[in-house]
């Protein structure tokens, strides 16, 4: 007896603990309420658990742990704290305490399920009160509430009727036990488990429910009528195409299907889950429909976008056909069921026509359509508001994902999308036309550019519209093909069509799917290559043949780049007087006759007259202090197709002519003025050697130094830079198969010459070279002044000698004191002038050496190895290096990295010794 009493005390204590825990859990969920409201909630919870514990245990609803997690998630969303802890943490502690008690697991699962319903209903009530539509009940929670409420109501009605079961125990006994206020009555029965789980007999139960009423058949009552099953299946079929049915309604916010609140109680848990699962196909169907509707604004744009939309509509039409077959099959079976006829002979793409259509069969059927609709939705979603090549590239990215069905689907979509693109390409490369209303073609025509700039600037690539599967070299070929056709038609006035044009167009448009092939060896790529080669050859033959492109390039090299040496020398000799005049006094009409005379007096007279007619001399606008050398230049004028090809290079020739003309100017000053004047005056001033010998000697040395520098510069520029690169250009032009190859080689030739002529280098190179030229001009001025003073003194001495000779003839010997004093004064002034002249010459020489040193330093630090080697050759005997300490210093590591002169075995390279093991 003592042991039974102790066990009873333990059970009572455990029941009290469980009751307290449940009370606190309800407070966590509902909050602190009035006592009568709290007791009512406890009473309702006790009834629900007692009535539905078996239903919860046998169903496939949420597990106990999932219920706890959902409760904590809902409580965490409230952001409410009690005594420094959140409500969810407090509930978690209470749940851990409950698991430590001797509570039946099934009863605890039922308790957590009902607490989840209570939490969800509490949040829903708060959301309605605050008019916040964002909080919605889960579909499965709705199923749970509906099922449990319906079962509870059934049990309550049985209690009122007093129906007894087969064992003579009234249903009121169940509710009587469950109606005990508080949780002790619930948990008391659950706590007795194992050996202590013997059922106690209650004598009051035998006197309840003795009425003479028969017990209904619950198994037959739970069976569903065929019409109800058919309605459920039809609701699922309707949802495939986005149509709402009896059991499935659309959520206006998410667009997904949810169970109907009124009819959810007629569904089992399995049926509800399968309906929600099947309705996913309708959700993705609606997404595809939205993407294929141009009025929504979520679809792709342009003609290629229209092709994608058309393909999506075709996919939807095929899907609708499959769903229609399911619907027809369901209607036939329904009619056969009504008529009592089993139609088992027919078979369709859906389930067998002779068998009943069920949700399980629909689940087996809908997998492939769902997979296809999901990928269509993903692809269409990625293509929103895209067009042209960008649209094609987006779809192209979905290829090769490892699924054969998806690869085939993407290939079909790409084939449809590339149809307009292939037609635009074929029209461009066969006719030279652009049919692009939506600006989705990767070739664009610039309307503001004139015909004279057609070849270089009229047509460009629109890189954002270039598909990923069209490589850049193929895009350039397509661009050049259409551009060549426009060039032949609009400039060369060639109206002939391409050979086999119709056949090429037929091949290209019939093989649109080959445009995104991984290997460019398809018939489509071969057709594009054929068009490119034929058009390029036609343009090249016309430009090299009738329009003499190569001859004109040779003419510009000889006259604008001073390759015809005798011509430029005679031209300067003819215009030397005009070149020294002020710029305002020079007129182009006077120079034209001098140009013609120079052409007739040199080997240029044997050139093609068509080439010579393009050569002209121009006078630029003069500025203050400009002379003829600064404003006179040669110009090569081109017209027609040549202008379209070469007009863009004319500014480069103009830039190149300036340093070459400046170099010729310095050569003319040194040879025809300074040196020639020195040689002519040396004999005349021989008698004054004692007075001017020092200055003359320094002048001769300085002149030789400058002439060596200028001659080296001319040799390097005219031969090593221009001539050598011209030879390379001729080789490339002979091997060229397209006009673009010639133009690209010519452009590279000009850019190389720009570097070799010190034009496109650092500003310090060009500036220091200009300082050298300015010192040469200063030397010319100094020499003119020097010889002027020398000849003035020489003439004074000769005049004095004549006076002495005349006096001797007259018999009067000697000079007057006045004459002697005047002569001595003039000699003294001349000596002072010679000293000043010597110092002035040294200043010019010093400035010259400084400029040359700066020029050499700039060459040594240049990025071009040829300029570095040229700097080394200019100072081959280290003359300037010995006189300038900066040139003797090693280059910094920065310049050593930029330099390509120093080899691996150079002493400037730091070599780490190899470690020996």
Swiss-Prot record:
It comes from Drosophila melanogaster (Fruit fly). GO terms for biological process: cytoplasmic microtubule organization; male meiotic nuclear division; meiotic cell cycle; meiotic spindle organization; microtubule nucleation; mitotic cell cycle; mitotic spindle-templated microtubule nucleation; spindle assembly. InterPro entries: GCP, GCP_C, GCP_C_sf, GCP_N. Keywords: Cytoplasm, Cytoskeleton, Microtubule. Gamma-tubulin small complex (Gamma TuSC) is a heterotetrameric complex which contains two molecules of gamma-tubulin, and one molecule each of Dgrip84 and Dgrip91. The gamma-tubulin in this complex binds preferentially to GDP over GTP. GO terms for cellular component: centrosome; gamma-tubulin complex; gamma-tubulin ring complex; gamma-tubulin small complex; microtubule; perinuclear region of cytoplasm; spindle pole. The keyword Lipid biosynthesis does not apply. Its main location: cytoplasm. Belongs to the TUBGCP family. Disruption phenotype: RNAi-mediated knockdown has no effect on nuclear positioning in fat body cells. The keyword Cytoplasm applies. It is found in: Cytoplasm, Cytoskeleton, Microtubule organizing center, Centrosome; Cytoplasm, Cytoskeleton, Microtubule organizing center; Cytoplasm, Perinuclear region. One of its GO terms (molecular function) is gamma-tubulin binding. It comes from the Eukaryota. This is Gamma-tubulin complex component 3.
């Amino acid at each position: 007896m003592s042991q039974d009493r102790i066990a009873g005390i333990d059970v009572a204590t455990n029941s009290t603990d469980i009751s307290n825990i449940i009370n606190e859990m309800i407070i966590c969920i509902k909050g602190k309420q009035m006592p009568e409201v709290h007791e009512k909630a406890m009473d309702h919870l006790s009834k629900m658990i007692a009535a539905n514990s078996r239903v919860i245990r046998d169903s496939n609803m949420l597990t106990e742990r999932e219920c706890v997690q959902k409760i904590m998630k809902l409580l965490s969303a409230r952001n409410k704290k009690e005594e420094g802890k959140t409500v969810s943490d407090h509930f978690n502690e209470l749940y851990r305490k409950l698991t430590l008690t001797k509570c039946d697991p099934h009863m605890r699962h039922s308790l957590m399920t009902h607490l989840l319903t209570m939490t969800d209903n509490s949040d829903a009530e708060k959301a309605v009160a605050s008019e916040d539509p964002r909080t919605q009940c889960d579909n499965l929670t709705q199923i749970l509430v509906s099922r449990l409420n319906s079962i509870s109501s059934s049990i309550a009605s049985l209690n009122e009727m007093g129906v007894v079961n087969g064992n003579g125990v009234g249903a009121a006994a169940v509710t009587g036990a469950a109606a005990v206020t508080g949780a002790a009555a619930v948990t008391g029965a659950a706590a007795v488990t194992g050996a202590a789980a013997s059922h106690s007999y209650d004598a009051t139960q035998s006197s309840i429910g003795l009425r003479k009423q028969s017990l209904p058949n619950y198994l037959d009552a739970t069976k569903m009528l065929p019409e109800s099953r058919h309605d459920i299946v039809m609701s699922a079929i309707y949802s495939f195409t986005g149509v709402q049915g009896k059991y499935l309604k659309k959520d206006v916010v998410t667009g997904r299907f949810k169970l109907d609140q009124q009819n959810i109680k007629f569904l089992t848990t399995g049926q509800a889950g399968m309906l929600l699962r099947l309705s996913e196909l309708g959700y993705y169907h609606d997404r595809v429909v939205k993407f294929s509707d141009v009025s929504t604004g979520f679809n792709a744009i342009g003609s290629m976008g229209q092709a994608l939309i058309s393909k999506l509509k075709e996919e939807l039409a095929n899907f609708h056909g499959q769903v229609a077959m399911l619907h027809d099959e369901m209607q036939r079976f329904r009619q056969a069921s009504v008529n009592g006829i089993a139609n088992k002979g027919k078979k369709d793409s859906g389930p067998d026509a002779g068998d009943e259509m069920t949700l399980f069969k629909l689940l087996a059927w809908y997998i492939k359509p769902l997979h296809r609709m999901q990928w269509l939705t993903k692809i269409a979603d990625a293509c929103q508001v895209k067009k042209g090549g960008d649209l094609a590239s987006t779809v192209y990215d979905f290829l090769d994902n490892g699924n054969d069905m998806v690869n085939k689907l993407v290939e079909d979509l790409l084939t449809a999308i590339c149809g307009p693109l292939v037609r635009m390409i074929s029209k461009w490369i066969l006719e030279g036309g652009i049919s692009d209303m939506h600006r989705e073609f990767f070739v664009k025509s610039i309307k503001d550019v004139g015909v004279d700039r057609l070849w270089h600037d009229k047509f460009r690539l629109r890189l954002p519209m270039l598909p990923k599967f069209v490589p850049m070299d193929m895009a350039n070929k397509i661009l050049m093909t259409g551009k060549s056709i426009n060039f032949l038609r609009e400039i060369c006035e060639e109206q002939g069509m391409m050979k086999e044009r119709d056949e090429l167009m037929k091949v290209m448009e019939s093989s649109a799917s080959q445009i995104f092939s991984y290997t460019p060896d398809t018939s489509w790529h071969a057709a594009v290559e054929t068009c490119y080669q034929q058009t390029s050859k036609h343009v090249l033959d016309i430009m090299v043949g009738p329009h003499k492109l190569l001859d004109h390039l040779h003419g510009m090299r000889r006259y604008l780049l001073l390759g015809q040496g005798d011509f430029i020398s005679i031209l300067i000799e003819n215009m030397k007087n005009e070149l020294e005049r002020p710029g305002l006094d020079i007129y182009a009409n006077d120079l034209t006759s001098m140009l013609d005379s120079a052409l007739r007096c040199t080997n240029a007279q044997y050139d093609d007259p068509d080439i010579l007619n393009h050569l002209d001399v121009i006078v630029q606008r003069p500025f203050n202090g400009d002379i003829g050398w600064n404003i006179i230049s040669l110009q090569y004028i081109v017209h027609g197709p040549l202008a379209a090809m070469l007009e863009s290079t004319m500014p480069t020739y103009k830039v190149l002519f300036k340093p070459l003309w400046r170099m010729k100017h310095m050569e003319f000053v040194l040879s025809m003025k300074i040196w020639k004047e020195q040689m002519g005056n040396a004999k005349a001033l021989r008698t004054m050697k004692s007075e001017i010998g020092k200055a003359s000697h320094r002048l001769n040395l300085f002149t030789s130094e400058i002439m060596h520098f200028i001659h080296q510069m001319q040799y390097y520029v005219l031969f090593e830079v221009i001539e050598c690169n011209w030879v390379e250009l001729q080789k490339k032009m002979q091997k060229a198969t397209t006009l673009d190859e010639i133009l690209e080689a010519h452009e590279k030739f000009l850019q190389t010459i720009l570097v070799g002529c010190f034009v496109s280098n650092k500003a310090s190179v060009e500036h220091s070279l200009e300082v050298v030229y300015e010192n040469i001009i200063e030397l010319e001025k100094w020499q003119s002044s020097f010889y002027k003073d020398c000849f003035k003194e020489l003439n004074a001495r000769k005049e004095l000698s004549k006076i002495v000779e005349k006096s001797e003839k007259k018999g009067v010997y000697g000079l007057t004191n006045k004459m002697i004093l005047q002569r001595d004064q003039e000699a003294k002034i001349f000596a002072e002038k010679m000293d000043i002249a010597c110092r002035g010459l040294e200043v010019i020489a010093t400035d010259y050496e400084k400029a040359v040193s700066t020029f050499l330093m700039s060459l040594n630090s240049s990025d071009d190895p040829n300029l570095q080697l040229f700097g080394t050759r200019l100072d081959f005997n280290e003359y300037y290096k010995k006189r300038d300490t900066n040139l003797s210093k090693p280059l910094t590591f920065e310049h050593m990295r930029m330099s390509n002169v120093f080899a691996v075995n150079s002493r400037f390279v730091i070599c780490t010794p190899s470690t020996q093991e």
